[in-house]
Amino acid sequence: MTWAELEKVEAYLKENGYRNGGKPYHCNADHYWYKAFGKGDNPYEEGRSLWQVFINVYDWRKFQYRDPNLQDASITASIHISMTINEVYIELNFDLKDDKLDLKAIEDKAYNFWRYVEDNFGAPPKE
């Protein structure tokens, strides 16, 4: 994927209410991986697929006692799309409303983005 293509993807994300989160932020909040597409449960493991979509869900409420600035924290989720052998990826972040962890809604959002990339830039590369 070229930089021009990446800019096109980013424009699509902004138009559709996604926020580009850049590099992942690691903290001590309770979190877990929720795999939507591709191979491998943990995206940081060696030998993972060159192309996959995976979802990281953080329950920040479990972290509030460590940081008073997180008084209003709820649950957030990010969708990562690993696109190239150089591990360039886009991280999509969005807050989950209420106190529900709606994995179906997250998966739908990830799938819609997956379809956009595949339709515009071709099928994922084979391993």
For every predicted segment, state its role:
Residues Y25, Y44, N69, P125-K126:
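Generic low-complexity segments that are intrinsically disordered, proline-rich and/or Lys/Arg-biased
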Residues Y18-N20, P24-Y25, I79, F94-L96, ...:
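Assembly/interface hotspot detector across virion components, adhesins/toxins, and nucleic-acid enzymes
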Residues G22, D41, R66, G122-A123:
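Selective for proline/serine-rich intrinsically disordered segments
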Residues N42-A105:
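Intrinsically disordered, low-complexity regulatory segments enriched in Ser/Thr/Pro
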Residues M1-G47:
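Negatively charged, low-complexity tracts enriched in Asp/Glu with abundant Ser/Thr
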Residues E5, V9-E10, T84-E127:
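Ampiphathic alpha-helical segments that act as solvent-exposed interaction surfaces
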